Amino acid sequence: VTSYGVALGLKDETATKTGINVTGTADLAPLDKQAAMVKEWVPDAKKVGILYCSAEKNSKYQATVVGAKLKEMGLEVKEYTAADSNEIASVTKLACQNSDVLYVPTDNTMASSAKTIDNIAQPAGVPIIAGEEGICSGCGVATLSISYYDIGYKAGEMAYDILAVSYTHLRAHETR
């Protein structure tokens, strides 16, 4: 789950320390900035389709947050969900027919089907703002993403600290 606070049921989802024996890194991208990119890259857009896999809780979380930000900007937002990869083509086609621009959050199912999405969105002339680099390189026009390399490196440092007898309940959660 992208938001560890949601996964752990923490009251303060923005806290950097869990207070329990859990630590690590998170790959949550800057969602407010990604939402702003929609307006920046497609300034005439009025309708935004958010395309994601309904089976991925992290994607639903991102869709909710980005959707709220886009609505605050005065854009009409509609979510288009696929339960699995078999539904992506039909859902993408529907989303493209009803949207000026698509937002695809960090989503494993969508990432593995980026070519399918691109084969539908590009001929339809519907640009895609992506939640991460992999989706962007497959079907997007822009992203503002995190670095999986940096996250992995930081996780390695944290693992070293744990193995060197640090106390995980004192260690802050970090995002890069």
Language-model regions: role of each:
Residues V1-A7, G24-T25, I128-E132:
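Short beta-strand elements of ligand-binding domains
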Residues T81-C96:
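Structural motif
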Residues D44, V48-C53, N58-Y61, V65:
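Conserved anion/nucleotide-ligand pocket segment
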Residues V1, V48-L51, S99-M110, I129-G131:
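Periplasmic-binding protein-like
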Residues T168-T175:
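Conserved small/polar residues in nucleotide/adenosyl-binding loops
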Residues A7-A45, I146-V165:
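Hydrophobic alpha-helical segments within soluble ligand-binding/sensing domains
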Residues G138-C139:
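Small-residue-rich helix-loop
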Residues L70-D84:
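Short beta-strand elements in bilobed, periplasmic/extracellular small-molecule ligand-binding domains
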